[in-house]
């Protein structure tokens, strides 16, 4: 493995990267990270991963159900999720990180969600974040993220933040 890494790095076109670079690419591509944007308690429709359940396994499919958690997963796919993972574009340059609460208004009220992943998106030239928020909030809506005692505007944005060059 070490020989392989050294051979790669001997090429002037190759540079080592770290987790920060990987994370910014993942964020811009709108890809969830287990333990942050999804976990065992977040169903596929909530995580924006409904596409991962084949039609043959859905209600009415030739082999519907039959997998662990099928009843709630299939019900949510059919009826829609109350909350879903969505993109947020903070106004300004301050990155909005994991755990930051999201509010409907600039003052008062309860949090309607929380940022699950966030950071700087070099390809989009600014901060990007993902949060689980109510599904009925339209793209383009302005919400507010509480950062260092202030509520900063964030715009609900479709995922991915960039046009992906990969195929599912």
Question: What are the functions of these language-model segments?
Answer:
Residues 1-168:
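Conserved, structured C-terminal
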């Amino acid at each position: 493995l070490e020989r392989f890494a050294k051979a790669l790095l001997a090429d002037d076109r190759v540079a080592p990267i770290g987790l920060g670079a990987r994370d910014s690419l993942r964020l811009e591509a709108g890809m969830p990270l287990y333990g942050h944007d999804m976990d065992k308690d977040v169903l596929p429709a909530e995580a924006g991963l409904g596409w991962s359940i084949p039609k043959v396994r859905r209600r009415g499919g030739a082999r519907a159900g039959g997998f662990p958690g099928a009843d709630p997963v299939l019900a949510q796919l059919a009826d829609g999720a109350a909350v879903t993972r969505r993109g947020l574009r903070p106004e300004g340059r301050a990155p909005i990180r994991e755990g930051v609460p999201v509010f409907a208004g600039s003052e008062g009220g309860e949090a309607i969600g929380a940022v699950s992943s966030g950071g700087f998106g070099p390809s989009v030239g600014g901060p990007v974040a993902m949060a689980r928020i109510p599904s009925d909030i339209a793209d383009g809506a302005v919400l507010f993220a509480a950062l260092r005692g202030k509520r900063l505007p964030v715009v609900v944005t479709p995922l991915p933040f960039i046009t992906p060059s990969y195929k599912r």
